[in-house]
Amino acid sequence: NICRSTMAEAILSHLLTERKVREKWKVDSAGHGDWHLGKPPEERTLQVLARHSITDYTHTARLITEEDFFTSDYILCMDDYNLEELEAMKPVESQSVLWKLGDFDLKGARNIFDPYYSNTIEIYEKVYTQCYRCCEAFLDYALKN
């Protein structure tokens, strides 16, 4: 919960502010594993966000909770593995809709690559571009429904 999901959270918050609907939304990110609990976003994530004028973003990695499934209309994840994990965690009574953010990728790339082990900032830029494209399409959908 320090690379892709935080990047998507920052982008989505930024887009909501641009569209002047930020106050109507709660945007957050969480992980299902405790590898980075309590840590800030990966430095390369913050560098790429800053390159795109998103500089007011802060976050502390946390685990998704059962409560999240009852307080969130949508829970978006990054790849098939994360979707499977979330589907297994989701309480039967929850009305949250689970999707991969990539389901909204107009270029059809349904999984968003984890750049954490990459040694180039360019991979983070590619993830940013895909997340931005997907967040815009998701917002177009969500604001209509």
Labelled PLM ranges:
Residues 1-71, 141-145:
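Conserved active-site segments centered on acidic
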Residues 74, 80-145:
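Phosphate-binding/catalytic loops
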